[in-house]
Structures are given as C-alpha cells and as structure tokens.
Regions:
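Surface/interface-facing alpha-helical segments and adjacent flexible terminal/loop regions used
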Residues: 1-129
Length: 129
C-alpha cells in the first residue's frame, strides 16, 4: 500500500498519545501543554508546506486533532487491555496495516520504554536553557 502523509501523521499521533498517556500528571501539566501546542503548530506548518489553503488547513487540523484525541481516549486503559482489545482499538486508525499484531507489540514495547523513563530525560536535550 502507498505511504501517505496522513499515514505518517497517524503513526506520529499514536506515539504522541502514548507519550502524553504515560507522562500526564498534575506536575507535568504545563510542560505537556507546551509540547502539545508545539506539535500541533508544527503539524499545521507541515500541512501548509504541502500546499493546502487556509480553509482546508482548518478542516485538516480539526480532523487530525479529533483523530489524536480519539487515539488518546482509546489507549487510555492500554496497560490493562488484552491483545484483542488493543487490536480493535488500533485497527480503527490503521485499517490498511497488514500486520496489526506487530504494531501492537511495537506499541507495547514503546509504552514500556516510556514508563521506565522520566519526562525530564526527554526534555534535557531540547530545553532552551
């Protein structure tokens, strides 16, 4: 199947959803909001670079934000879901993905890696100070 901007964005949004799921605490609220805002600003710039006009950009951004929040909602209980539930959840966003079980395994690993690190371990290398 064809690799598209939309597919790549869905992959990114899924990673970002896991990132927010793992690190969302009251203590991290402000910095995570800044990261969220930054990511969606960058997405909008990328969509503009592809050549979408202002009206279609607003619709595209709304669509992508809705997809992101749907992913975030669907993975909320990832840690307690069985494999079949995980497949059902991710299949909604990756319906053309042939090896969904590999994707589930990958995101299980990604989730575990994130949960073993602190948010600060990711922020050290990107801070402005």
């Amino acid at each position: 199947s064809q690799d598209t901007f939309s597919d790549r964005l869905t992959i990114f949004l899924t990673h970002f959803a896991f990132f927010l799921k793992v690190y969302k605490t009251e203590e991290n609220k402000k910095i995570l909001q800044e990261i969220y805002d930054f990511n969606f600003r960058q997405m909008e710039l990328s969509i503009r670079e592809i050549g979408y006009g202002d009206q279609s950009i607003n619709k595209k951004m709304k669509d992508y934000i809705n997809v992101f929040h749907a992913i975030l909602s669907d993975i909320h209980f990832w840690d307690t879901m069985n494999n079949e539930d995980k497949i059902n959840k991710l299949s909604k966003f990756f319906n053309n993905y042939e090896k969904i079980d590999h994707l589930i395994e990958y995101f299980n690993d990604f989730n575990n890696i994130l949960s073993k690190k602190t948010l600060n371990s990711f922020l050290k290398s990107v801070s402005n100070s």
